[in-house]
Structure formats: structure tokens, C-alpha cells
Amino acid sequence: MGKNEIVAMILAGGQGSRLGVLTKKLAKPAVPFGGKYRIIDFPLSNCSNSGIYTVGVLTQYKPLELNAHIGIGEAWDLDRAHGGVHVLPPYQEEKGGEWYKGTANAIYQNIEFVDRYDPEYILILSGDHIYKMDYTKMLDFHKEKQAEATIAVIEVPMDEASRFGIMNTREDLSIYEFEEKPKNPKNNLASMGIYIFNWKTLKKYLREDESDKTSKNDFGMNIIPSMLGNGNKMVAYPFKGYWKDVGTIDSLWEANMDLIREDNELDLHDEEWKIYSVNPVRPAQYIGENAKVSNSLVVEGCVVNGQVESSILFQGVQIGKNSVVRDSIIMTDAKIGDNVVIEKAIVGSGAIVRKDCKISLGDEIAIIAAKEEVKMGTVIENNKAV
């Protein structure tokens, strides 16, 4: 097997329990986003756009839909004879296998895969964040600083810093302390869960960590503190673009709504940095004679006969006559009947809302699970899936 300078590993096994019924039957990275994407499309596209063509995707929880979506990686130009994309479930041995015990253990179980390409560096990514990043710039920074580990960081509001892993740095951006969700943070440089390591160095720490039976086998809790404690040079790479952890209902809704704001930082129309995905061929969308659509994303295959305001309609969505959909996300192939009102909701893929229903919880976000049916005349008054 030939040598690669860098191999990317995407941690995509998360259950996404905070997304409730939206991840009941699929992994968090497979959750639909932005009308025609899935969350995993962002790190995969970033890798391809950065010229990184050897990518491992580490799956675990409910992987079938995610595996089918990735396939051989053709959508991201990752269907390659050398390298390409590889889906990597927890390793199975003759004595039996087990789930990944933590983020570090997930990489440890795939040391043999990485070693096939003999890389100088390894890029560790999360499969559940929305952002666009040129990883080659981060790698150049890592080399320039002669670091053994580089961690991408982003400034967050100080009153939210206690929700993140915080990097305390010197003026030269070298890291002298890492605090996991500190009660009283010293600064607001939050880890983005994006790491570049010198592979030989990381491999040594992974093996040591695996032999420690008290370890949580986690990068934030174990690997990074160990490297800092031993004096390995670690630096913070500041990122200035759009980045969103969409691990909660609120953040997923907000990230989708960001796409229809005038000051949208993500800009999915950027021809220089496209986000790729797998989408079936659909007919053009149809907007009925009495329909009204404003400030919304309406993609292929949609049929709209009602009113749609500040919403995102995924492929194949149908909106009935005299219905109003406002501030909502309607996922693939969902069907909304006649005389329905839906406000500030997420309607899962394939769900059916029969006629004469009202779904509106004021400031709360209403959730309808994928493939669920809301019966005719239903009024949803609490934040529970039907």
C-alpha cells in the first residue's frame, strides 16, 4: 500500500440521544439537513475539497442508513483505487467484538487501517458538525508550528464557554491547559473536535491509553491531558468561519434556519467550496396557483399548494391547500394535508400530517418523528412525538 501524507478519520458513531425521535432509527451524522444534505456530507465534502482522499468513517449506532448514504463515496469523489472512503464498524475478532468504548478507542481499534497508508499525520473529525473548512490550511499551520498535535478552536460567547472543552493558550497559540466544560472558564477558545496529530506520536498514546483500565478512552478526557502533561507541543488553530454543533433539537433547527437568513455565513451556493451529497433524481418542484412561498428553501420534487414562510422543504414534500407552514423544517417525502397549520416544527422524513391539524407550541420546537402519522384534526399541545 502506498504512502499518504495524511489520513482522515471521521467519528460518526454517535447515538444523538439529545435529538430524541429524530435519531431513533438512524445515527446522528445521517440526520437530514438543509433541504438536500445529511450532516455527514460536511466533513466528507471538506475532506474532498481539501484534497484528502483517504477517509475512514467510524460507525456504530444504527449505521444502515448512514452506510447506504456513503456507499463507495462517489458523490464526494472518494471512490478511488488507492485510498477512498471506508466505513469502519467496531472491529470484530474471533473472540468477539465490542462497541467503541470512546473516541480514542475508536481510533485505536483502527490502527491497522491507518498504518496501511503509512501517513505522517492523522486528521480526526467529528461527523456531526456543520461547517466548511480547508484542512490543508490547518495542516500547514501544524507543520509551521512544528507541533505534535493541533486542535481547531473557535471563539464562543463567554457565557456559553462552560458547555465546551476550552483551550488555554499562550500568545503563540501553544496550549498550556485544557479544561473540559469548566465552571469558570478562563477564555472562550472552544475545541471544535477537529485534531491533527503526528501519527507516530498519537499511536504511542493510543496504545498506552488502551492499557490503562481506568481510562475513559476519550481524546478530551485522556489523550489530550496526557500529551499536555508529558510536554508534547500542542497548538490551537483559530477558525473564523461558520461552525455549529447540531447535537440538540434547538441547534439543529437554528442551523437550518441560518440558511435562509440574509447574513447566512455558511453559503451553500459557494462554487469554490461545494457541499456534495447523494440525491435521487426528482422532478422540478411545483408551486400551485394559490400557493405562496417566501424566504424559504424548496428543493426538487416538492408540491406546494399552501403557504410556506421562512421554512425548509426537503425533497418530495407535499403541502396541501389552505395550509400554512411557518418557521419549520419539513424533511424528505413528508406529506402535509389540507387546512393544516404548522409553526416552528421539525417534521421527520416520510411523516404524514392529515388535514385540519394544528402543530404550534409557541417558543418551543414541535417534533414529529419520521414515518409517523398525525391523525386528522389533531392539535399538538406538548413537545412530544406522536
Swiss-Prot record:
Q: Which residues bind alpha-D-glucose 1-phosphate?
A: 100, 165, 180-181, 191
Q: Which domain of life is it from?
A: Bacteria
What the entry lists under InterPro entries is as follows: ADP-Glc_PPase, ADP_Glu_pyroP_CS, GlgC_bac, GlmU/GlgC-like_hexapep, NTP_transferase_dom, Nucleotide-diphossugar_trans, Trimer_LpxA-like_sf
Which catalysed reactions does the entry list for this protein? alpha-D-glucose 1-phosphate + ATP + H(+) = ADP-alpha-D-glucose + diphosphate
GO biological process terms on file: glycogen biosynthetic process
List the pathway annotation.
Glycan biosynthesis; glycogen biosynthesis
Query: Is-annotated flag, keyword Mitochondrion?
Result: no
Keyword S-adenosyl-L-methionine assigned: no
Q: Which SUPFAM superfamilies match?
A: Nucleotide-diphospho-sugar transferases, Trimeric LpxA-like enzymes
User: Which Gene Ontology molecular function entries are recorded, alphabetically?
Assistant: ATP binding; glucose-1-phosphate adenylyltransferase activity
Q: What class of enzyme is it?
A: transferase
What keywords are assigned to this protein?
ATP-binding, Carbohydrate metabolism, Glycogen biosynthesis, Glycogen metabolism, Nucleotide-binding, Nucleotidyltransferase, Transferase
The catalytic activity of this protein is classed by the Enzyme Commission as 2.7.7.27
Subunit description: Homotetramer.
Q: What does this protein do?
A: Involved in the biosynthesis of ADP-glucose, a building block required for the elongation reactions to produce glycogen. Catalyzes the reaction between ATP and alpha-D-glucose 1-phosphate (G1P) to produce pyrophosphate and ADP-Glc.
> Which family does this protein fall into?
Belongs to the bacterial/plant glucose-1-phosphate adenylyltransferase family.
Q: Which named protein is this?
A: Glucose-1-phosphate adenylyltransferase
